[in-house]
Amino acid sequence: GKTWSEPRLVTGFDEQTACLVRLPDNTILLVFGHKTDGSGQRFMASFDEGRSWSRTVYQLGQNCQYASTVLLTGNRLVSVSHRIIDGVGIFHARQWSAPKKTAFSDGGFWTPRPAEPLGVARSR
């Protein structure tokens, strides 16, 4: 965190609540919420410190938002997310493992373009 690169667009418009997780092999997973075609959690991977990201995007769960993910022992991950059903807030936890590096490579990689600010939100 001593230095930061220029901001870049990685996931696309209307993706939110991102969480970065570094695996023991130095793979970085970007877990994020999406609202572009429904809502849910997805993730993608970088094997070069975030310079490029997998074109392959994996669906983690649907109809859930605001997930946070942590690494457990044995390369297992747990994602906790929030969902509202009939006006009641419900938390979900999913334990999972990232696919092998070769599974990501099948979809290729892309280099994110610079991010452009969309505006400033203000609250009172």
State each model region's role.
Residues G1-R124:
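Asp-box/BNR beta-propeller blade signature and adjacent active/binding-site loops
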